[in-house]
């Protein structure tokens, strides 16, 4: 898998987790909202680190 493909995959994953966080926020399940946001930030940071290489 090329670095560009991995970067796109990481961005898609972080986007999915952001959507999940919004869904849990609407259901007022704030613990899962925080967990999903943390995972999304983690994937986003990894994708950005891959960008800088």
Swiss-Prot record:
Q: Where in the cell is it found?
A: Cell membrane
Q: What is this protein's name? A: Antilisterial bacteriocin subtilosin biosynthesis protein AlbB
Q: Which domain of life is it from?
A: Bacteria
The answer to whether the entry has keyword Cell membrane is yes
Is the keyword Transmembrane helix in the record? Answer: yes
Query: Which gene name belongs to this protein?
Result: albB
Alphabetically sorted, this entry's keywords are: Antibiotic biosynthesis, Bacteriocin biosynthesis, Bacteriocin immunity, Cell membrane, Membrane, Transmembrane, Transmembrane helix
Membrane topology type, per the record? Multi-pass membrane protein
Which species does the entry assign this protein to?
Answer: Bacillus subtilis (strain 168)
User: In UniProt terms, what function does this protein have?
Assistant: Involved in the production of the bacteriocin subtilosin. Required for maximal production and for optimal immunity to subtilosin.
The membrane spanning regions, by residue number, are: 8-28, 30-50
Any one annotated GO CC term: plasma membrane
Biological process per Gene Ontology, one example term: bacteriocin immunity
| Induction annotation | Transcription is highly induced by oxygen limitation and is under dual and independent control of Spo0A-AbrB and ResDE.
